[in-house]
Amino acid sequence: KYIVEHYHILNIIECNDKYIDTQQDTIILMIQNKKLSSNKFYMKISNYTLFGTKQNIIKLQALYKESTTLDALDFDVNVGQIVWNQCKNELTHDQSKTRLIYSSDIVNNKLSKKQYSNKDKKNYIEREGFTEPLLVINRGYGMGKYTFDYCIIQNITYLIENHLICIKPRNKKENIVEMYQKIIHSFQNNKTQEFIELYFGNNAINTSELCKILPIYV
């Protein structure tokens, strides 16, 4: 935002080689110490300023057409609150207790129950849980492309481990499962994958970006 308000962007160049020893993709940002009215190299969405080459900004603007965001749809996005190895004394095999859902429990977009070789890691926890439907996302990579592995949690009492991302409404919605299904359908949209490759590359998507930047097609 400061750059946009105080400087003129001369050019943004994507570098094809990796930066020294980090193997990170890099760009060259060329700015001039004066302000001119030009928005060829950036756009604004949800109070964020997105930078890119002129070609990429044009593509991003096209991908945002007829889209919304989870934030605009009145959803919050956060990570699960349970760090399992910090509450080992509360974990149990007792199936009458609250189900603790780990990232590895989401397989092929369905909830499974994994048996762990680590005996301290158990599938249930002696805490009060939640019962309302919840959409969880396990961020991952597959065949060089960023992929979502997601699942709607419902009809059980649960808590979520901190390696999963949770999407939930800020206020109660009667048709919440139907709305979750529409969000999932948006994740499956080819335009979503195109946006992710263009904007995020192979970088991790944080909760703020998922909530306020990723376009949702519903």
Regions inferred by a protein language model and the residue ranges of each:
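Signature of N6-adenine DNA methyltransferases within the class I
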Residues: 1-81, 85
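Polybasic, glycine- and aromatic-enriched phosphate-binding surface used to engage nucleic acids
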Residues: 63-218
